[in-house]
Amino acid sequence: MRINHLSPSSHKPDYTHRRYSCIPALWPVCLGFEAEENARQNWEHTLNFIGEAYRINHELSPVWTTQNQITLDLDTMYLRDFSTGSQNLPVLLDAPYAGHSATIVDFAPGQSLVKAFLDNGHPQVFVTDWKSATEEMKDFTIDTYLEALNLAIDELGGEVVLVGLCQGGWLSAALAARFPKKVKALVLAGAPIDTQAGNGVIKKLTRDLSMSNYKALVKRGNGRLLGQFMLQAWKGMHPDQQYIEKYIDLFLHLDDPHYVKQTETFARWYEYPLDLPGAFYLQVVQQLFKENLLVRGEFMALGKKINLKAITVPTYLLAGKSDDITPPEQVLAATHLIGTPPSHIAQKIVPGGHIGLFMGHKNIHEVWPEIAKWLSGMTD
């Protein structure tokens, strides 16, 4: 049952009894009044906390900040159009398909990667809004998603600036290597290209756990990797923060509307996971993370073995210094794996972790505008 939040005025106690506190004979009575009032306030605060904690975990869902329309509806995704004008090369943001909504690229006012491109010389922006997998989608493979990405590019005229984020990064790199003429410039941000580089958490998990463990997870989801499984795994990486500290912080800041709004904004995205097709997920674990086939030149994409050296277009590599999901080494390895001349490769390591690469305030207002302008200079 949802607990209704009390209005701020209901938190204001009536202290009229304190006018009598100067009378020694009434001190015990006044202390009793204060104890009762404090108990009532604490109880109301606790009820509000319970209601808000339930709300952020169960009642919120992802929202888009910037006006857009669906221009293509596929089994795997919606292709969303955020354009405010036209340009020679549209920008296609390939959002992560790793258990959370694509709204990370349009997270909140002032924290929108979409807006960063729109406001910095790229009026035509599209986003791959990957769909949560239904049971009917359980047998979809990597090829299914490559085919969808390829179709989206065709829908946009056959040539794009492709921006691959997180798990969308390796998919974008594979697409660019498979169809090099369709990608005129490439950005890889927080993207695991060489999955055996560095000391990331995912590298460790995929190294230490056998495929039977991953298959068991998919079996539990009736052929899918359920988003809730992934969410609990991510939370388990920082249990103190996720299960204790964030609730203490919420309790202490419950009367701060700005804090509550920020908490709800993040919860809309983080606490609303997507399911993945089991076949797709198991292929990613086996072929990309365990066998590192993309780097070895052994990865099959839509019937053809691909080589990252086929990528020769201007490429920007962005990594987070303290990213424990995709350490910088995994991203920057692309420098010597792709065929682009060094003079047309830019790279940057920014302070912070993984998620902040795509929605952190400083990155959105300083780093991504720089990338957008670099792309303009390279593709004009």
Model segments located where?
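Short beta-strand/loop motif that positions the catalytic acidic residue
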Residues: I311, L317-A319, D323
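Conserved alpha/beta-hydrolase "acid-adjacent" motif
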Residues: D324-Q330
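Catalytic histidine-centered segment of alpha/beta-hydrolase-like enzymes
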Residues: Q347, P351-E366
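Short beta-strand immediately N-terminal to the catalytic nucleophile in serine-hydrolase-like folds
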Residues: L162-G164, A189, L318
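Alpha/beta-hydrolase active-site loop
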Residues: M137-E155
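Alpha/beta-hydrolase-fold enzymes
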Residues: M1-A35, G157-G158, L171-A279
